[in-house]
Amino acid sequence: MSATSSPQQSEGADFTQRVTYTFMIGVYLAVNAIRDLYLLIEGPDCTYMKTQYVQGNHDWLSTLTSVSGLHRIANTALHPAQMSGSREESLQATLQRIASHPAVPAVALTSMPMAFITGAEYARLTRQVARVSGKPIIHVQGKSLSGDWIDGYAEVLLSLARQLDLSGGSPCETKA
C-alpha cells in the first residue's frame, strides 16, 4: 500500500463511519409509508426506540407507535443470552400473534445482524404464518451492516414485490 492510498481503497471495502440514517430507519420509513403493514424485528428493545427517528423528526403524524398500545413496530426483545438457543418457535408464535389481530392486514419480519447470523429460517417462518393466518407475511432480509436508509427502504419494496401475490388484483379507481 502506498503512502497516498488508504486501507479502504486498497482493500476494496469501505468501513468508514457514515453520516446518514441506518438501514433499519429506511425499513421504518417504508413501513410508515404503507399504512397496512406492521413490522416485527428480531432484535433487542432498542429497535423500538428508533421509531423516534421517524415520528419525532420526519412524520409527526406517523402511526408506527400509538397511545392505544397497538404499535405497528414490535420487537422480540432479543438478548445476547438467548442467542445460543433456538428461537424459531417463539418467533413464530409472536409473528402469529401479531398476524391474528383483526386490525393487522399484513406483517413484515426483519432482523438485526445479531439475530440474522444465528441462521434462523425467516423465509420459512413467514410462509408458515402466512399459510395459517391467511394474511401476507413478508420476510425483509436484515442487511443492516451493508447499507443505509435508502437501501433499507428499497429492500422492503423489493421484498413486497417478490413475495406478494398480486394475481387477481385490480387497480384502484383514482379519486378525483
Language-model segments: residues:
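An N-terminal assembly and electron-transfer interface module characteristic of large anaerobic redox
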Residues: 1-176
